[in-house]
Amino acid sequence: MKILVAYKRVVDYNVRIQVKPDGSGVVTEGVKLSPNPFDEIALEEALRLRDKGIATEVVVATIAPADAQAHLRNGLAMGANRAIHVVTDQPVQPLAAARTLLKLVEKEQPDLVILGKQAIDDDANQTGQMLATLWGRPQATFASKVEVASGKATVTREVDAGLETLEVDLPAVVTTDLRLNEPRFIKLPDIMKAKSKPLETLQLAELGVEAGAELKTTTYAPPAKRSKGVMVKDAAELVAALKQKGLL
C-alpha cells in the first residue's frame, strides 16, 4: 500500500506576520518557514500506518519554489521513503494545488492520499475536497482517528453533534485534524539518512498545470488597532457607557 502525503511549507506559526507597505501581501523574505502543522500530522499518520505494516511506502510531496528542498528533507527525516518537489515560483491556490496533486496521483497511483485539513497561511480548507472531486474518489475530512483494513479506511471525525464515523473505499483522500496524533521528534541520525533518500524534482509546467490565481486578493491590511479599554465599577456604569457610545 502506497500513501502520498501533501506537505506544504508555510510561514512558521511563531512568526509575527507583517503586511507589506504597499498592501500587496505579507512579508515572507527573511522569515522562518516551516512545515504546515496539519501536514506534519498527516505525514505522522502515514508513517504510523507504515510502522504497523499496513503501508509499504510513504511519498511526501510539495509545490514550492526551488529553495524548498530542505523542507522536503525534513519530511524525509521524519521517515518518508522518498519525496517529490514540484517547482514553481508562483503562489499556488487550492484549486491549482489540487490539480497538481491529481497529476501526482495519476503518476504514483497511491492507495491513500493524506493531507492537512487546511494550511495555516490561508486557512482555506479546500485542497483535499477539490482533489477528491477531481480524482472521483471518496473523501473523509477532519480526521481525528484513522484505521485502514481490507481495502477500506474508517475515519472518525469531530462534528458539532459529537463524533461521526465514516467508512470509505480505497483509494481515497483523508484530511487530518490536530487531534489525530502528535508528530514524532526528528533525531540527528534521521536527518543524516534523509540526505541520501530519493528526491524527485518536477517543474509545474511539466505537469500541464498553471499556477495562475483564480481568486485575486486586491489588498492586505493588518487588523485595526483596538482602542483603550474603559474600566467600569458596576452594571449601571456599563449601561451608561454603552448608551453614551450609541450601542444601546
Q: Where on the chain are the PLM-derived regions?
A:
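N-terminal glycine-rich FAD/FM-binding segment characteristic of electron-transfer flavoproteins
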Residues: M1-L248
